[in-house]
Amino acid sequence: MGLLLLLVGIGGGFGAMARFALTQATASISKQIPLGILLCNIIGSLIIGMMAAFLIETKLFNEDVSTYVRFLLVTGFLGGFTTFSSFSLDILNLLQRGEIFIAIGYIMVSVLASLIAVILGFYIVMGVYK
């Protein structure tokens, strides 16, 4: 339990730093749309799909190393990198500014693009191992 907690903490710290860096890097691109969080959630979905396929195809899914990889990268890094709470706050901010259609579009793009990314990531890696 202690090692897994440490792995989650290390992964989460790096994931949060990566999210911060991406949101800062994209802040000047769009003042209206929270592009950084949108990209974090899409990229995170792509990576989690790739990780799922990788763990299945490399047969690491049932081995001890799989547990460590999942806790470090999936629970830790991707947990710190992606964020539903920031996504929700971004939507609230858009609604409070009266930007209802932008908020609806942001919700639709976020959910659909993230779903497409997780499917794409999964099948990209599955294709590599076939």
From Swiss-Prot:
Keywords: Cell inner membrane, Cell membrane, Ion channel, Ion transport, Membrane, Metal-binding, Sodium, Transmembrane, Transmembrane helix, Transport. Its main location: membrane. Na(+) binds at residues 79, 82. GO terms for molecular function: fluoride channel activity; metal ion binding. It is found in: Cell inner membrane. Na(+) is not transported, but it plays an essential structural role and its presence is essential for fluoride channel function. It is a multi-pass membrane protein. GO terms for biological process: cellular detoxification of fluoride. InterPro entries: FluC. The chain crosses the membrane at residues 2-22, 36-56, 71-91, 100-120. Belongs to the fluoride channel Fluc/FEX (TC 1.A.43) family. Fluoride-specific ion channel. Important for reducing fluoride concentration in the cell, thus reducing its toxicity. NCBIfam families: crcB (TIGR00494). This is Fluoride-specific ion channel FluC. It comes from Francisella tularensis subsp. tularensis (strain SCHU S4 / Schu 4).
